[in-house]
């Protein structure tokens, strides 16, 4: 079956794009999708679908205050979005300005820190921070949370808490692993009380997660690269779960991408690396049995991933139901619980 970009398009009324979080994390809705069966529930009901012995795998990345504002030496305004720190004093970043800064030029950020433009590769600039300034410290001191482009407002005080998961601990992302935003301590406690386990991976979400697919022939699309870490304890927890007949529940497409990337060359192994894995229908999943995820943008690689996991027609029907039922979409929107379909097309 040959798929094109148009196979992953759908009509979404703009008013269904959530612009702010709900008052409570777990107050969001949950669309449970198991083949042709759809069930409208609340996220607080998630533990009802988890069995004793199942294992949920979370992404513990923390969103950086990656957006900085400043000026060039010429006085022109610049907006800097740090994609990733490189060591303590360098970073890759996207820069928005009327004219791109030249290598060797200096930017003054937040009227406090002078950084040097070392060079450019594609859409990213290589920046050097002062020797007495750690990149992450500068971001936390002067930066702003980088809300997604479809949230049409500036980040506010509420986002400081709500655009981070309650278990975020490894700084490095420019976007939240949004499936994790629904979990609060009460839901986590109920999952543990049911006998479910929790394990952790880290995948630092890059700015490329918002880049559109620009080719109709999906084989020509190249994914952005993201850094991940799979701890040995997580590998062992997954092995125990499998041995005892439990299911592995990936919380979010970021957890899914980390797990499946680490299992492509053979059995799942602990370690760290980078992945540009592109998951399309026909992909053979090796780790996750279920997936907790939000609703994704039309024509996005994440919509392709969930279609690969549960089936293109299944996801198409589920999204049509979600639109008709006025679910809230994208980062601050509602959630889905999907079951893997090994015969998905």
UniProtKB/Swiss-Prot annotation:
EC number: 2.4.99.17
Keywords: Cytoplasm, Queuosine biosynthesis, S-adenosyl-L-methionine, Transferase
Subcellular locations according to the entry: Cytoplasm
GO terms for MF: S-adenosylmethionine:tRNA ribosyltransferase-isomerase activity
Gene Ontology CC: one annotated term: cytoplasm
BP-aspect Gene Ontology terms: queuosine biosynthetic process; tRNA wobble guanine modification
UniProt KW Cytoplasm keyword: yes
Annotated metabolic or biological route of this protein: tRNA modification; tRNA-queuosine biosynthesis
Keyword Transferase applies: yes
Reactions that this protein is recorded to catalyse: 7-aminomethyl-7-carbaguanosine(34) in tRNA + S-adenosyl-L-methionine = epoxyqueuosine(34) in tRNA + adenine + L-methionine + 2 H(+)
Short name of any one Pfam family annotated for the protein: Queuosine_synth
HAMAP family in alphabetical order: QueA (MF_00113)
Assembly description: Monomer.
Free-text function comment from the UniProt entry: Transfers and isomerizes the ribose moiety from AdoMet to the 7-aminomethyl group of 7-deazaguanine (preQ1-tRNA) to give epoxyqueuosine (oQ-tRNA).
Family: Belongs to the QueA family.
Protein name: S-adenosylmethionine:tRNA ribosyltransferase-isomerase
Organism: Azoarcus sp. (strain BH72)
């Amino acid at each position: 079956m040959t798929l094109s970009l148009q196979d992953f398009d759908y009509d979404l009324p703009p008013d269904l794009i959530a612009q702010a979080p709900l008052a409570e994390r777990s107050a969001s809705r949950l669309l449970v999708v198991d083949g042709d069966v759809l069930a409208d529930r609340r996220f607080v009901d998630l533990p009802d679908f988890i069995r004793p012995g199942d294992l949920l795998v979370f992404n513990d990345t923390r969103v950086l205050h990656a957006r900085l504002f400043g000026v060039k030496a010429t006085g022109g305004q610049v907006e800097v979005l740090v994609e990733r720190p490189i060591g303590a004093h360098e970073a890759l970043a996207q820069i928005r300005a009327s004219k791109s800064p030249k290598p060797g030029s200096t930017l003054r950020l937040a009227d406090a820190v002078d950084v040097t433009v070392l060079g450019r590769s594609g859409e990213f600039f290589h920046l050097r921070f002062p020797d007495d300034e750690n990149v992450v410290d500068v971001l936390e001191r002067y930066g702003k949370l980088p809300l997604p482009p479809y949230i049409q407002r500036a980040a506010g005080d509420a986002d400081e808490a709500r655009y981070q998961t309650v278990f975020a601990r490894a700084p490095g992302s420019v976007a939240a692993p949004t499936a994790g935003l629904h979990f609060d301590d009460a839901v986590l406690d109920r999952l543990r009380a049911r006998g479910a386990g929790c394990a952790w991976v880290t995948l630092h979400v890059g700015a490329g997660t918002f880049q559109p697919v620009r080719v109709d022939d999906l084989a020509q699309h190249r994914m952005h690269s993201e850094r991940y870490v799979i701890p040995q304890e997580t590998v062992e927890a997954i092995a125990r779960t499998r041995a005892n007949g439990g299911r592995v529940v990936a919380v979010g497409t970021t957890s899914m991408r980390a797990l499946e990337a680490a299992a492509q060359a053979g059995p799942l192994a602990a370690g760290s690396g980078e992945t540009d894995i592109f998951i399309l229908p026909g992909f053979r999943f090796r780790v996750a049995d279920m997936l907790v995820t939000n609703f994704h943008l039309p024509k996005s690689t994440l919509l392709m991933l969930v279609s690969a996991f549960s089936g293109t027609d299944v996801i198409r029907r589920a999204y049509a139901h979600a639109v008709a039922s006025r679910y809230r979409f994208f980062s601050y929107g509602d959630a889905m619980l999907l079951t893997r379909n090994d015969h998905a097309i």
